[in-house]
Amino acid sequence: MLDRSSRPVPGNNASGKHRKSLFASFLSYYAPQKHLFILDTICAIILACIELAFPQILRSLTKGLFTQSKDAILGSLVFIAVGLVVMYFVHFLCRYFVISWGHIMGARMESKMREDLFDAYERMSFSYYDRHKTGDLMSRLVSDLFDISETAHHGPEYLIIGLLEIAGSFVILAFINVPLTLVLAGIAAVLVVFNFFANMHMRGIFKENRMRISDVNTQLEDSLSGIRVVKGFAAEDHERKKFRASNSAYLDSKANMYQAMGRYQAAISGMMGVLNTVVLVLGGWMIAQGQMQAIDLATYALYISLFTTPIMNILNFTETFQKGLAGFKRFTEILETQPDIQDAPGARDIQITAGEIIYQDVHFAYNNAEEVIDGLNLHIESGKTVALVGPSGGGKSTTCALLPRFYDVTSGSITIDGQDIRSVTQHSLRSAIGMVQQDVYLFDGTIAENIAYGCPEASEEDIALAAKRANIAEFIESLPDGYDTQVGQRGTRLSGGQKQRISIARVFLKNPPLLILDEATSALDNESERAVQESLSELAKNRTTLVIAHRLSTIMGADEIITINHGRAVERGTHDELLEKGGIYAHYYQMQFGGAPNIARR
């Protein structure tokens, strides 16, 4: 089907709603951690209260107790010490909880988001992966979610502690000296305004930085996945140049980011220096005028730190917040993207009674491009083996990809036993179809785990029987670790024929009524091809089977051979019938078995 991914494009009025929706979505991840969040909040409040209390305690003692007699002071020191020890022990416990369990809360939220993101990736249709780079998707799963986790933890901590300390210290500062506090508030307002505009500038820089690290991840994933091709073409220098180009672009964006951060931090520090200078000079003038006591200025200086430090923390946190916000936006973009292929409302499980497949006037195009399938009509009878041949790009693989709904038809219909495949659930449809492809993918794990992929409940006996039917059991049993042998990522420790037969064993174990064999032997040597072909012949018995093959020797015995060209069925018949027609199939046969006569393509 054409691209139907739904991404909201908010206008001016929708922008606010989108921000609210984004905020509500973010808050929803706190819900499972609400008890931890409440405790974290309580500890943060206690920390703020203790921080605010100490300068006031010092001021009271200096103005009161410490002006009394020596005996009075010494007699009270034990009680003061005990009180402060208790207070700072509570401070220690709360600080430990906020730092450790606050981060654990963020990590749990990150873990849940990572699961949700992976689930979203698994839901996406093939067309989504046709449009997106793997490195970018990996970056969202790792880098973005780490930044979101930091925001989830430090956001409430800095806001709760910071706002309490700012409000509390401001009230106390005003209580000590109103004019000086108004000056302080004015300078703080300049700090906030400066921070607002600086963040607007840095937001674009952070976004650029994320794009560059995604490019690095994509280049790395591409080079490592294709390392055998790289080595085979001695193209290491070429790959190094490509990687260094993307890495250099990332370095430039990161240098730009750090320069912006440096300018920002330096400007903030300069403003803080101005603030301290103004307070000290103005406070000294007030002391000289008899409008303020020296102890009040000393206490005032302590509270300035309590007033400005949380402001600095909150302003500095905006860097983390910007990264987290950018990451969460990218995160929600994926969660809100609807897969192109979805179950219809009320979709039922497919019921395979015979295995008859009908393509009726099927049209298909990739992403609004030129049609690949153009009015295709096929009738594949139950239990028959039908081979599709034709030129590369003629539509053979696309024809097979439409059957399990990896893509949806643009128009027309495909039915199995009279059931339109769009009216049944994807899970039941794909469970009814077994696929053996040219490019076999084995997962990092044991041979047994790979054979049982899709059937994790299979017993050892079932796995061994499937391997035997696929003509791979003897080889597996000759290995020191047998079925527990590690295959390596993508099956790198096995030959092409061995991997192919393991993939066939998978399908034997799955035991589906429908089968698709897509160039299953084209990459094998003659000996491996014979072994695999025997396995495939056994596999195709009593199943409706679609076969794609360029090696005509593998499909001569098919019940019917259909030539696909330009997305249409242009010839059909048995091997002998098509040779007699002298058409495209006969031309291919002559090229493979009787030389390559100069016959125009039909």
Outline where the language-model segments fall.
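Juxtamembrane helix-loop junctions of ABC transporter transmembrane domains
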Residues: 11-19, 42-43, 50-63, 87-134, ...
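Membrane-integrated ABC transporters
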Residues: 1-51, 66-80, 98-102, 106, ...
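An intracellular "coupling" helix at the cytosolic face of ABC transporter transmembrane type-1 domains
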Residues: 32-35, 126-127, 143-152, 156, ...
